[in-house]
Amino acid sequence: MPSYIVVGGQWGDEGKGSLIAYLALKDEPQIIARGGVGTNAGHSVFINGRKYAVRQLPTGFMQTKARLLVGAGVLVDPGVFFHELEHLKEFNVAERVGIDYRCAIIEPRHKERDRASSYLHDKIGTTGSGCGPANADRVMRMAKQAKDIKELEPYLTDVAQEINDALDEGKLVLIEGTQGFGLSLYYGTYPYVTSKDTTASAIASDVGIGPTRVDDVIVVFKSFPTRVGEGPFPTEMSAEEAERLGLVEYGTVTGRRRRVGWFDFEFARYSARLNGATMLAITMLDKYDKGAFGVTDYDKLPRKAKEFIEEIEERVGIPVGIIKTGPELEHVIDRRDTL
C-alpha cells in the first residue's frame, strides 16, 4: 500500500501514537507526514521503557530512515518545534524534518487570546495552545506563514510535492492524523470540537494528496473511549467506576483527567463510515481484558478479549487489522496479512 492514513475514531487519545510508532518501525515508510490541527494534540510513545511525547512533529520520528514532514494544513508553533528537535536529538530529527512553507504560525498573541477567552476555557475546554485563534486568523488571511519566520528557513519545503513525487516513485508514505472524529469541526459534537475537520479526507488535504492517492485508511479506537474537556459523551461512566476499573488517564497536552466511557458501537460504525475506513485498529485491549496484556498472537487471546474484537468487526462492519495489548511497541497483534 503506497500510502495510508491513520486517524482517531473517537475523541482523541485513542493510542494513535504507539500504533504509528509500530507502523513506522514495522513497515519502514520512506515518508512519515503529519496532518491535523497543530500543537493542541499530543502523541505519546514508549521506547525501551521511556516515554516520548510530541505535539508538532510526526510520531514516527523513531524510524531514522524516514523523511519527516509537517503538512501545509498544520499550524506550527516555532517554540514547540525547536523544543522537540532538541528533545529528539538522539533520533537525528533535525536533519530529516521538513515543514511546508505554507503552514500558518501560532504566535504568542494567539495563545493569549485562547487562554483569556472564558467561553473557550470554561465552556469548550480549550487546551490553550492558540490553535483556534491562529486558525481564525488564517481564515481571515491574517496569519503569518512558515516562510515568514527566518528561524524556520532551513526546514522549509513543499510537502505536497515531496509526497506526490514519492508516490509516483512507488515509495511508502504514512500519514498521521491527530485528535479524533468526535472532535471534528464538521462532524463532531459541535460546539465542543476543535477548530477544523479531523477526518481522513481532511488529513489527506492537510498534506496535499487527493483522495485517489490514498490506498488505506486505518481508524483507531480504544477499548474504553476517553474525552478531555466539555461536551456530550453518551456512554460516559462515573469517575468512581473508572477508578475501580483502573482507567484513570491524564491528557498529554493539558494534564487534565480524561473522562472515560464504555465502547459505543453505533458511534464507531458512523465514524468508520465517514472516515472511509478500510481497516480498524483497537488499542488498550489489555484494559478491557487484563489477560490480553502483552499477547502478540491473536489465537492466544483470552476468550473475553477475542469476543470483543469479533463483536466490533460484526457491528462496525470493518475488519480489525491491528490490536494493541500494552504500551510498549512490541505489545501488538498484527493481522493485516490475514485480512
UniProtKB/Swiss-Prot annotation:
InterPro entries: Adenylosuccin_syn_GTP-bd, Adenylosuccinate_synth_dom1, Adenylosuccinate_synth_dom3, Adenylosuccinate_synthetase, P-loop_NTPase. The keyword Cytoplasm applies. GO terms for biological process: 'de novo' AMP biosynthetic process; IMP metabolic process. GO terms for molecular function: adenylosuccinate synthase activity; GTP binding; magnesium ion binding. Keywords: Cytoplasm, GTP-binding, Ligase, Magnesium, Metal-binding, Nucleotide-binding, Purine biosynthesis. IMP binds at residues 13-16, 40-43, 127, 141, 179, 194, 256. Mg(2+) binds at residues 13, 42. Its EC number is 6.3.4.4. Belongs to the adenylosuccinate synthetase family. Plays an important role in the de novo pathway of purine nucleotide biosynthesis. Catalyzes the first committed step in the biosynthesis of AMP from IMP. This is Adenylosuccinate synthetase. It comes from Thermococcus onnurineus (strain NA1). The lineage of its organism: Archaea, Methanobacteriati, Methanobacteriota, Thermococci, Thermococcales. The gene is purA.
